[in-house]
Design a protein with these regions (language model features):
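Short, charged beta-turn/beta-strand-edge "cap" motif at the junction between a beta-strand
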Residues: 263-267, 281-284
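Carbohydrate-binding surfaces in secreted/extracellular proteins
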Residues: 277
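Short strand-turn-strand beta-turns centered on an Asx-Gly dipeptide
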Residues: 217-218, 260, 280
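Intrinsically disordered, low-complexity terminal tails and inter-domain linkers enriched
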Residues: 1-35
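Catalytic-core "active-site belt" of small-molecule-metabolizing enzymes
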Residues: 32-233, 247, 270, 274, ...
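A conserved acidic, glycine/proline-rich C-terminal tail/linker
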Residues: 238-266
């Protein structure tokens, strides 16, 4: 599926973006930074409302023509609205770290988003699908930091900053209609992050590069893969997270979660499922689905 297929292309799309830019930039003396900040706040609120109200929205980037850097500004502004309601930051997630995910989503760049405590669901419990619009699930690896990460790390340093690793599943739920978006839209939408289920953490960080990954629905294998699909070694996701956070002027406190990215393509969720992931030598995680998406 090419998720950018409906975002518009060619002269018509370029003209629309140019007209939008002109309308914003030539406000008869209006301060551009004020206009830009207002637009970012407006788009952040649109995405926040879509998530809160479980109401999909049309893609935003084709209309407003924002850049990737501006998409991250929208993302942070949207997460700030969550924080203002009392949600607490708990870590970060990386996206498009596997070739399968890039192909499925029709993009070619690694992206990252922010996690809050409201996104965490109890392992083994029922996850109400009415919390989402059109949820999908993907098997992942999650790291727990033992020390503050305040600078870019090398692969050789990473283990010294980690308390453990766990099998995990991420529930993704694009706020865009029919799960169709371009790169800027998905970044603004916090990389589609909606929920996280974690298994037990283990301190054993050895040999993470090629462990078998199986995700099952009601006991039937629906996705098979390897941790090697995550940048060749999931520990490289920690390196990338440290670089991205530092570039954004952020630190990751001790006790932060780092969702390393998907090992396989995502699968759509439906009511009445027992969903599980097992990772060789690491353990498993599971949940059930209740309600209706």
């Amino acid at each position: 599926m090419n998720v950018a297929e409906d975002h518009g292309s060619g002269a018509g799309s370029a003209m629309k973006r140019a007209q939008t830019g002109a309308a914003l930039g030539a406000q008869h003396g209006a301060d551009w930074e004020t206009v830009r900040a207002g637009l970012i706040a407006q788009l952040a609120a649109t995405l926040d409302d879509a998530a809160r109200l479980r109401r999909e929205t049309d893609p935003l980037a084709p209309v407003h023509g924002f850049t990737l850097d501006q998409a991250y500004e929208i993302q942070r502004a949207s997460i700030a609205l969550r924080h203002a309601r009392g949600e607490k930051p708990v870590g970060v997630k990386l996206g498009f770290t596997s070739r399968a995910k890039m192909v499925q989503m029709g993009v070619d760049s690694l992206i990252w988003g922010l996690l809050t405590d409201a996104m965490l669901y109890e392992e083994g419990a029922a996850v109400p699908l009415e919390h989402f619009i059109h949820p999908r699930v993907e098997p992942e690896v999650c790291f727990l930091t033992s020390r503050e990460i305040d600078r870019p790390l090398t692969l050789a340093e990473v283990a010294g900053y980690l308390a453990g690793v766990a099998p995990a599943m991420e529930i993704i739920d694009s706020r865009f209609r029919n799960f169709k978006f371009n790169l800027e839209d998905v970044v603004a939408d916090n990389c589609s992050s909606a929920g996280v289920v974690l298994g037990e953490f283990t301190a054993d960080l050895r040999n993470l590069a090629n462990r078998g990954v199986t995700m099952r629905f009601n006991g039937r294998a629906v996705a098979l893969g390897s941790t090697g699909a995550i940048l060749g070694n999931p520990l490289r996701s920690v390196v990338q997270a440290s670089r991205l956070a530092s570039a954004a002027g952020l630190t990751l406190p001790a006790g932060s979660l780092i969702m390393a990215g998907a090992a396989t393509a995502a699968e759509a969720l439906a009511p009445g499922l027992h969903v599980s992931v097992s990772i060789g030598g690491m353990g498993h995680a599971e949940f059930t689905t209740g309600g209706q998406a």
